[in-house]
Amino acid sequence: MPQTPTRLVSPYGSDRLVQLAARLRPALCDTLITVGGLEFPAHSLVLAGASPRLGCRGRWALVEDISPSTFAQILTFVYGESIELQPGELGDLEEAAKALGVQALEEACQRAQKGKDEDELDPGLKRHQQSEDFMRGSERGLGSPGEKQKPEKDFRSNGREQEMSHKHKAPGERPEMAGATRMMSSEEVMRGIESHKGSEESLRGCPDPLSPPGSLLTSLIPRPWWAEVPRLGEGQSALWSILLWPSRYGAPFSHSTPITAAWQVRPQDQRIPLTLNHSKALWSQNQLASSSPTPGSFPQGTESLSPWQIETSGQGFTGTLATCVSQERTLNCPSHQHPPLPSPARSRPYSCSVCGKRFSLKHQMETHYRVHTGEKPFSCSLCPQRSRDFSAMTKHLRTHGAAPYRCPLCRAGCPSLASMQAHMRGHSPSRLPPGWTIRSTFLYSSSRPTRASSSPGSPTSSAAT
């Protein structure tokens, strides 16, 4: 059986903005995309509505393995026009749509491939069943019961004859002739529907009719997010969500925008790589300052990158790579990369020698170890209360008036070290004892003076907090 061209119906055809842009193209285009030496003018607003990865205005080039003919088909689909694919082009178009993030086109290709696989299994029986169910559902909502019994009976008898001829087909019969006797074309089905009055209302009243191939594919393809908005008025679509697209794509060019040297094409070896942040879907434009024109170089200095970012950046640039010459950058769209999850031994290297409990910080392990030893090195200077860690003593000091700092001259309390410093400016330094420091105003004492500089309960760390 010869392969027929595959027809994909674009879901963007009902949008006024896309239709207007397609009618005006190449006028008012603020984007010029270079693919394989060919230039394609487009509107960044229309491209952004189809895929966030394409919503980049200016002059840029695709360096991914996408042919100019395939990219032209993608633009035709995005601008609301149907495309016809020859045998063998469906797979390349699906891969290109997946790489560029055009989800509607990718789903349409997958749906067409699935239908083609089902047709290859048993095309005659499947098409006949679809046509029969569709006509049965259409006649269910038309005319009186007496009028629809006869056509249904005739259609069933005709279907049985066709099925019997399919079963008892001669071995030498050509497959295309057999397919022609078994299939009912979509034009014949639509002609039969239009002959009835109120066919549109009957179709809406059908429980679940199956559409014939090529007739109602528009209802099977999901509409994009910006086409689901209700209409504001007659003939006007409420497509303000496109107009309120985030400002990272910039404003379109006007007729008065001067053409500067930024439109000059840069050589392939001078394109500046720039990674795409998938987690936030934002173009990392702030990495241009420290980037170099050497291919494969990092977008920014390694001193500002985390270790896992340096590791993944050193693996090279994969995925869809585009070069924005007007912004002097190359957009890299790698696959989702996440930092490796740390192992428990690496995240909690300190363990208790008594119970084996692990901790990420050493002072946490030391504080926990005092549970086994019963040591309480921190004591309150106002009462006999003692604590094994600094945080518990800080909470205890709040019971004395939430003023853990006390002036040695007037016994006034202060909530923080800064307020105590401001308070001490009101006293004469001559009244203070020799060797006095501001840290001695904190109302706690530790029985471990040798670790005063490094322990979490030291006056230095407490004053800093």
Swiss-Prot record:
Pfam families found in the cross-reference section: BTB, zf-C2H2, zf-met
InterPro entries for this protein: BTB/POZ_dom, SKP1/BTB/POZ_sf, Znf_C2H2_sf, Znf_C2H2_type
GO molecular function: DNA binding; transcription corepressor activity; zinc ion binding
Gene3D superfamilies for the chain: Classic Zinc Finger, Potassium Channel Kv1.1, Chain A
Region annotation (Disordered) ranges: 111-179, 285-310
Zinc finger (C2H2-type): 350-372, 378-400, 405-427
Residue span, BTB domain: 29-87
Family from the record: Belongs to the krueppel C2H2-type zinc-finger protein family.
Subunit text: Homodimer (via PTB domain). Interacts with the N-terminal of FANCC. Interacts with ZBTB16. Interacts with GATA3.
Known role: DNA-binding protein that binds to the to a 5'-TGTACAGTGT-3' core sequence. May function as a transcriptional transactivator and transcriptional repressor. Probably exerts its repressor effect by preventing GATA3 from binding to DNA. May play a role in regulating the differentiation and activation of helper T-cells.
PANTHER family for the chain: MYONEURIN, ZINC FINGER PROTEIN
Protein name, entry field: Zinc finger and BTB domain-containing protein 32
Lineage, broadest ranks: Eukaryota, Metazoa, Chordata, Craniata, Vertebrata
